Swiss-Prot record:
Active site, renumbered: 977 (proton acceptor)
Compositionally biased residues, Polar residues: 243-253, 453-465
Taxonomic path: Eukaryota, Amoebozoa, Evosea, Eumycetozoa, Dictyostelia
Name of the protein described by the UniProt record: Dual specificity protein kinase splB
Stretches the record annotates as Disordered: 1-54, 77-253, 352-423, 453-529, 571-599, 710-753, 1134-1155
Encoding gene (name): splB
A GO cellular component annotation in the UniProt record: cytoplasm
Organism field: Dictyostelium discoideum (Social amoeba)
Limits of the Protein kinase domain: 853-1126
EC primary class: transferase
Residues the entry annotates as binding ATP: 859-867, 880
Residue spans crossing the bilayer: none
Length: 1155
C-alpha cells in the first residue's frame, strides 16, 4: 500500500472528475478520526523555507509497506513537516491511478469490518499492492491503519487527487507508450513497480532558481487548480522519519529511517532495507557551498548508515542492510548533483537537465513522462514569461509546450540545451543475474558504469570522483561458495517482458563468454554487517578537513577540485589505473577492478567499472586507507603518527599477520598465564602468490582475536597484449578478502613493499574488563590499541576524547605522543637485548671468573657494597662488590639469597642477572645507563630542573613496575625494599626492579616472621612493619608501589617536610598519607588509595593492579586531560631524562640510607 502525505482538498476542482473518487471521499468523511502517534506543528499554509543553513527537503513521503521484506509492519509514524511538491503530485498521482481500478474492485468485495490485527502476509507482487493516502488535518497525520478496510477507504479517497491535471497542455509531450487508462501520461509509475522492473530515472534538478521562498499570493490563486500546492514549503527544520514495528518476531523491534539534509537538490532516496519505501522531496532552490548529508537507517541495533565526506564537497551515503535484506542503497553526489543507486533496481538511468531559464519563477512544475522502459523524466523546463497565468499553468503538474519531454524506448531524454549527458548505470549480466529476490546475488548491488561523463556549458569536464561506500553482504552460511561471472563488454538490454520473466525464475549460473573475468569468493558471517555499520560520527567542517576523514575515506583520488593536502602521500597508497589523458576513477571502500584500455579517450568513450562479484567478497573492510598506509613503506606520511583515534574510527581495523611462526607464538602467548609482555612483529607484504585464512583466537581473550589473513584475488585484463597485476594484502577482522587490482596496459610491474609493525600482546588471563587486554597502557598509536577494535560485537566505548578534540592537541599532547612512540621503540630494542642476553647465559654457568671482567669506573658506594661499571665478554655490565660486615656466615647467606632471587627473576622488568663471583663476592648484572628513578626525579646532586612525566608515561612506568612485582610474587619472592632508589632505568627509559639484598622467599603459609633490622626505607615503609606486628605478607610491596607511583606522578619525595622516622611513625599511627594532586585521573587516584590502605588485607593484589592500570590507559588513549596538568607539565621539560653524571648510573643501587 502506498502512503503519501498529500492531503486531498475537498471542493477542489481537481478532485471532482470521477464519481468513484467522489464516493471514496464521501466514505472517507464518514470514517471516525483516528488518533495519531505524532503531532506535527507545522503551519502548512504560510510556512516558508527560510533557513539558509539547514533545509530539510523531504517534501513528500511515499512508502510501500507491502513490498517490504519485513512482514507484519502495522504502524507508520511520521515526524517532521510536509512540503508541497509538484513533482510529488505526479508521483503520488501515478501511484493512485496505477491501482485505482483494482482497489475499488477489492473494496466492493471486502466486508465492512476487518480484524484489528492482520497476520503477516507473504511478499506480494506489485500488481496486488494497494495505494492509500495519508490523512492530514490541521498539520496532523493519522497513521494507525488498524484494518485493511480503513486503509482502502483512505486510499480511494485520494485517488483522483490530480486526475484533472493530466488533461491539459500535453499535446507536445511525446510518449511512445500510453498504457494507463486514467490519463497517466504524465505520471511516474508507482513505487511498487520499481522493485520489480528495470527503471530509468531521469531526474532534472532545478538548480537555477535563486530563491527558496515562494509567493504565497500566487499559491493562493492556484489553490483551486493544484490542491497539492497548499503546503508550499515549511521552515520547520525537523527531519522526517518512518518507523514501523516488526510483528514477525517474538519481540517487537522499532525501526526508524531518518533523513537529515541541508542540500538543495536532493530529490529522492530509495532505501533497499525497506525495499520500495521512498522519501521524495522537492528542490527548494537553495544552494549550499558545502553540502553535508547524514542518512541513517537502523533496522537492527548494529545497523546504521555510512557517510563519506571529501574535501572537495563530494560525499556518499550508504544505508547498511540488515539480515533480512540483501544489500544497501547508495547515494552519490558530485558538484552539488546527486545520483541515486538503488540495489533493488538493476538498471537506473539518471539524467540531470538544468533547463529552467526563469530564475524568478515561484515554483516550477516537474513534467513527467512514462514510456515502455518505465523512464521517469522530471524536467524543469520553463521558458515562459513571469506573468501569473503562466505561474498557474506551471503549478498544474502538466507538460509545458516546450517539446522537451520526449521519451522513447531507447531511454533518450532530448532537451533543448542538453546541458548534462546521461550517467547510465547498466547491468551487463541481467540475463543471468536479474533476480531481485536473490539475496546471494551481489550483482544486484554493484552496477557497471558506462559513460560517466559530466559536460556542463561545453567545457566537458569529467566527473573526477565516484564514491560508493561498502554495502553489507547478505546473511548466508559461511560454508557457501558463490561463483559469479561478469562481462566487461556491454550487452543489449532485455525487453520489459523478458526482464519480468527473469525476475520470476530462480538464479542460475551462466557460462562466461571469452572476454570475462571470473572471481570465486567465500561468504562470511553476519558480523561483517556490523563492521560496516560503524558511524563516522562528526559532520563538522573539522571532520571534513581532518586527517581522520582523509585516510578513513581513502582519498587517494586524483581530482582537479580536490585540495587534499595529503594527496601526494596517497598516490602510492591506493592502486588505480591511470593512462595518458585519462582521469583516475577510484572507490573508497569497495574493491574495484579498474581497467583502462589504451584506446580510451576523454569525452564520451566508455569507461568500464567492473565491480567484483560475490556475496560477501571484498566488501567488508571500511578502512582501506589504513590498509594502504600500512602496506606501503615508501609513503612519506604515516597514518599512525600524531593522531588520535577512538573506537568509532577503527571499528573494523586490525593488523594482518603473515608469518606462520609469529602466529604460533601469539597463540601460545595468549594461552599462557604468566604476567610478561610479548612483543609481536608483523610484516605485511603486498604481493603474495596464494591465499589462505589463518585465524588465531583464544576463548578467554575476546578482544585479542588476531586474524592472519593473506587473501589475494588476481585479476588480469588483456589489452594491447600487456597484462599487469598488482595485488594488495588485506587488513581485516575476519576472513573477508579485500583486494585492489590495478591493470595498467602500458607497463608490467609487481609491487612488493613491507612495513614492520611492533605491538604488545598481553597474556594475562585475569583481566577485569574485556577491553583491558592490551598491555601497552599509554600508547594510542601502536597496533596494540588498534587490536582492541577487532571484534565487531564490541559494546563499550572508551572514555577518551572525541575526534574533534583529539585533532586539536596542545604541545603537551604531541610531546606525550612522541614519548609513547619512543617508548614503543625502546620496548622493541629492550626485548631484543633481553633475548640476546638470555641466549648467551642459557648455556653457561652463572659462576664468572673475576679475570674475565673489565672494571672501568666506580659509579657508587654504600655501607654494604660498591658498584662498578665494566664489561664482560662484550656485554656492558654493572659489578656489585659486597663488603663483608659482621658475621661471615650471615654475609654468605645474604649473598647466596640475593643471587638465587636474581636467577629466579627472569623478567624484562627485572634487572638481568648475568653471573656471580665468590672470591671476591661480586654480583654481575646488566648495566642500566639511565640510573635510578630517584636521581632522575629529584636530582639531589644536580642543579638541572626535575623531570615531570606526562600522564601516559606515568601509566606506562607504573604498569612496568607492577608487572615486575607481579612476576616476583608469582615465584613467591617479596622484595621488601621497593623504593625509587631501587627502580632503575636503561638508556631508553624502561623501568626495571633491582637490589634483592633484602628480598625474601615467602613461606607456604603466606606470611613471614618479622626480623630485626630496618626493612625498607622509612619514607616508603609500610605501617605493619613500623608497628612490628610480628607477621607480614607480600602486601608490603603493594604499599611501597603506591608511594613510588605517587612519586612519579608528582615528582616529589614522599613526606619531604618530615624526617624519615617521623614520617613512618605518622603513617603507622596517625594514618598519614601523601596528598594526591587534582590533575590525577580519578580511577588512578582510587587505585592509589586502595594500595596504601592500613590493613594489608584491604590492599589489592598485583593481578588486579595490572589490569586496572590497563583499563585506565584504555579509557585515556592520550592521557588524562586537565588544565592543572597542563600547567604542571611544562612543554619545554624533557619527558625522558638520564642522569647527567654517568658516575651515578648503576644497575645495582646503593644500600638505602636514611634521608
Amino acid at each position: 500500500m502506498g502512503i503519501t502525505s498529500s492531503k486531498p482538498v475537498s471542493g477542489s476542482n481537481t478532485t471532482t472528475n470521477s464519481p468513484t473518487n467522489q464516493k471514496a471521499i464521501s466514505e472517507k468523511k464518514q470514517k471516525p478520526k483516528r488518533t495519531n502517534k505524532r503531532n506535527l506543528s507545522t503551519d502548512s499554509k504560510s510556512s516558508t523555507c527560510s533557513s539558509p543553513t539547514n533545509n530539510y527537503l523531504a517534501d513528500e513521503l511515499v512508502v510501500d509497506l507491502n513490498s517490504m521484506e519485513i512482514e507484519g509492519a502495522d504502524s507508520i509514524q511520521y515526524s517532521g513537516h510536509s512540503h508541497s511538491s509538484s513533482m510529488t503530485n505526479s508521483m503520488t498521482n501515478s501511484m493512485r491511478n496505477s491501482a485505482n481500478e483494482k482497489q475499488l474492485q477489492q473494496k466492493q468485495q471486502q466486508p465492512q469490518q476487518q480484524p484489528q490485527q492482520q497476520q503477516p502476509q507473504p511478499h506480494q507482487s506489485h500488481d496486488d499492492l494497494n495505494s492509500s493516502a495519508l490523512d492530514q488535518d490541521d498539520g496532523e497525520f493519522n497513521n494507525n491503519f488498524e484494518n485493511e478496510s480503513e486503509v482502502e477507504s483512505i486510499s480511494s479517497s485520494s485517488i483522483n487527487n490530480n486526475n484533472t491535471n493530466n488533461n491539459s497542455n500535453n499535446n507536445n509531450n511525446n510518449n511512445n507508450n500510453n498504457n494507463n487508462n486514467n490519463n497517466n501520461n504524465n505520471n511516474i509509475p508507482s513505487i511498487s513497480n520499481i522493485s520489480n522492473n528495470n527503471i530509468n530515472n531521469n531526474i532534472n534538478n532545478n538548480n537555477n532558481n535563486n530563491s527558496c521562498k515562494q509567493k504565497n499570493s500566487k499559491n493562493k490563486k492556484n489553490k483551486n487548480k493544484n490542491n497539492n500546492n497548499k503546503n508550499s514549503s515549511s521552515s520547520n527544520e525537523r527531519p522526517y522519519s518512518i518507523s514501523y514495528d516488526n510483528e514477525g518476531s517474538t519481540t517487537k523491534s522499532n525501526s526508524t529511517l531518518s533523513l537529515y539534509s541541508n542540500i538543495s537538490n536532493l530529490h529522492s532516496i530509495t532505501s533497499h532495507s525497506i525495499q520500495d519505501a521512498s522519501i521524495v522531496c522537492e528542490n527548494c532552490n537553495h544552494h549550499m557551498t558545502k553540502p553535508i548529508h547524514l542518512l541513517s537507517l537502523s533496522l537492527e541495533p548494529t545497523s546504521a548508515a555510512s557517510l563519506d565526506i571529501h574535501r572537495n564537497g563530494n560525499f556518499s551515503i550508504t544505508l547498511a542492510s540488515n539480515s533480512r535484506s540483501s544489500s544497501p542503497a547508495t547515494i552519490l553526489q558530485q558538484n552539488n548533483k546527486h545520483f541515486l543507486i538503488n540495489s533493488n533496481i538493476n538498471i537506473i538511468n539518471t539524467s540531470l537537465n538544468n533547463n529552467n531559464k526563469n530564475k524568478d519563477e515561484d515554483n516550477v512544475n516537474n513534467n513527467n513522462g512514462n514510456n515502455s522502459n518505465n523512464n521517469n523524466n522530471i524536467n524543469n523546463n520553463n521558458d515562459e514569461d513571469n506573468d501569473e497565468d503562466n505561474d498557474e499553468n506551471n503549478n498544474n503538474n502538466n507538460n509545458n509546450n516546450n517539446n522537451n519531454n520526449n521519451n522513447n524506448n531507447n531511454n533518450n531524454n532530448n532537451t533543448s540545451n542538453n546541458d548534462i549527458p546521461d550517467l547510465s548505470w547498466t547491468n551487463y549480466n541481467s540475463d543471468s543475474f536479474n533476480n531481485n529476490n536473490n539475496n546471494n546475488n551481489i550483482f544486484n548491488t554493484f552496477l557497471s558504469i558506462s559513460s560517466p561523463i559530466s559536460d556542463q556549458q561545453n567545457t566537458s569536464p569529467q566527473i573526477q570522483e565516484i564514491i560508493s561506500p561498502l554495502p553489507s553482504p547478505p546473511t548466508v552460511q559461511q560454508s557457501d561458495v558463490i561463483q559469479q561471472t561478469t562481462t566487461t563488454s556491454p550487452s543489449p538490454l532485455p525487453s520489459p517482458q523478458k526482464q519480468k520473466q527473469q525476475q520470476q525464475r530462480p538464479l542460475q549460473k551462466s557460462s562466461p563468454p571469452p572476454t570475462t573475468i571470473t572471481t570465486s569468493t567465500t561468504t562470511t558471517t553476519q558480523f561483517n554487517n556490523n563492521n560496516l555499520a560503524s558511524s563516522l560520527g562528526s559532520t563538522s567542517d573539522l571532520f571534513n578537513k581532518s586527517l581522520i576523514s582523509s585516510f578513513l575515506n581513502g582519498q587517494g583520488i586524483s581530482s582537479i577540485n580536490n585540495s587534499n593536502p595529503f594527496e601526494n602521500s596517497y598516490k602510492n597508497q591506493i592502486n588505480s589505473s591511470t593512462n595518458s589523458g585519462t582521469n583516475t576513477f577510484s572507490n573508497t571502500n569497495t574493491n574495484i577492478n579498474t581497467t583502462n584500455s589504451s584506446n580510451t579517450n576523454v569525452g564520451y568513450d566508455q569507461y568500464s567499472f567492473n565491480y567484483s562479484n560475490g556475496s560477501n567478497s571484498n566488501i567488508n573492510n571500511s578502512n582501506n586507507g589504513l590498509k594502504s598506509f600500512l602496506s606501503n613503506s615508501n609513503s612519506s606520511f604515516s597514518a599512525l603518527k600524531n593522531c588520535s583515534y577512538d573506537a568509532k574510527d577503527m571499528s573494523s581495523f586490525t593488523i594482518t599477520l603473515s608469518n606462520s611462526e609469529l602466529n604460533t607464538m601469539i597463540a601460545e602467548s595468549l594461552n599462557r598465564s604468566s604476567a610478561s609482555n610479548s612483543i609481536v612483529k608483523s610484516s605485511n607484504t603486498v604481493h603474495t602468490t596464494s591465499g589462505g585464512n589463518n585465524s588465531l583466537c583464544s576463548d578467554g581473550y575476546n578482544q585479542n582475536i588476531i586474524s592472519a589473513t593473506t587473501n589475494t584475488n588476481t585479476t588480469t585484463t588483456n589489452s594491447s597484449s600487456t597484462t599487469t597485476t598488482t595485488t594488495a594484502t588485506t587488513t581485516t577482522a575476519s576472513t573477508t578478502n579485500n583486494n585492489i587490482n590495478n591493470n595498467n596496459n602500458n607497463s608490467t610491474s609487481t609491487t612488493n613493499s613491507t612495513k614492520d609493525i611492533t605491538f604488545l600482546v598481553c597474556d594475562n588471563p585475569d583481566s577485569t574488563k574485556e577491553k583491558s587486554n592490551v598491555s601497552n597502557t599509554s600508547s594510542i598509536i601502536s597496533a596494540s590499541n588498534l587490536n582492541r577494535h577487532i571484534t565487531p560485537n564490541s559494546h563499550m566505548r572508551p572514555r577518551g576524547r572525541s575526534i574533534s578534540e583529539s585533532l586539536i592537541m596542545s604541545p603537551i599532547n604531541k610531546e606525550s605522543l612522541n614519548d609513547i612512540q619512543r617508548a614503543i621503540e625502546s620496548e622493541k630494542i629492550k626485548k631484543t637485548k633481553f633475548e640476546e642476553l638470555k641466549s648467551i647465559l642459557g648455556e653457561r654457568e652463572y659462576i664468572i671468573d673475576i679475570n674475565d671482567i673489565q672494571f672501568i669506573q666506580k659509579v657508587g658506594e654504600g655501607a654494604f657494597s660498591e658498584v662498578w661499571e665494566g664489561w664482560w665478554k662484550g656485554i656492558h655490565v654493572a659489578i656489585k662488590k659486597l663488603k663483608i660486615i659482621g658475621d661471615e656466615e650471615q654475609f654468605k647467606e645474604r649473598f647466596i639469597r640475593e643471587v638465587q632471587n636474581l636467577k629466579k627473576g627472569n623478567h624484562q622488568n627485572i634487572v638481568m642477572f648475568i653471573g656471580a663471583c665468590y672470591k671476591p663476592a661480586c654480583i654481575i648484572t646488566e648495566y642500566m645507563a639511565g640510573g635510578s628513578l630517584y636521581n632522575i626525579l629529584h636530582n639531589p646532586n644536580s642543579s638541572t630542573p626535575k623531570v615531570k612525566y606526562s600522564f601516559p608515561l606515568v601509566l606506562k612506568m607504573a604498569t612496568d613496575m607492577a608487572l615486575g612485582l607481579l612476576h616476583l610474587h608469582s615465584i613467591t619472592i617479596v622484595h621488601r625494599d621497593l623504593t625509587s632508589q631501587n627502580i632503575l632505568l636503561d638508556e631508553l627509559g624502561n623501568i626495571k626492579i633491582s637490589d634483592f639484598g633484602l628480598s625474601r622467599e615467602k613461606s607456604r603459609e603466606g606470611s613471614m616472621t618479622m626480623t630485626n633490622g630496618g626493612i625498607c626505607n622509612p619514607r616508603w615503609r609500610p605501617p605493619e612493619l613500623t608497628k612490628n606486628l610480628g607477621h607480614y605478607s607480600e602486601k608490603v610491596d603493594v604499599y611501597c608501589f603506591s608511594l613510588v607511583v605517587w612519586e612519579i606522578l608528582t615528582g616529589e619525595i614522599p613526606f619531604s617536610d618530615l624526617d624519615g622516622s617521623q614520617a613512618s611513625a605518622q603513617v603507622a599511627y596517625a594514618g598519614l598519607r601523601p596528598p594526591i594532586p587534582e590533575y590525577c585521573d580519578p580511577e588512578l587516584k582510587l587505585l592509589l588509595t586502595q594500595c596504601w590502605e592500613a590493613d594489608p588485607n584491604d590492599r589489592p593484589p598485583f593481578t588486579y593492579i595490572v589490569n586496572k592500570l590497563k583499563e585506565i590507559s584504555w579509557n585515556n588513549p592520550i592521557g588524562f586531560v586537565s588544565d592543572q596538568f597542563y600547567q604542571y607539565s611544562e612543554p619545554s621539560t624533557p619527558r625522558l631524562a638520564l642522569s647527567n653524571q654517568s658516575s651515578n648510573s648503576s644497575s645495582i643501587s646503593l644500600s638505602p640510607t636514611k634521608l
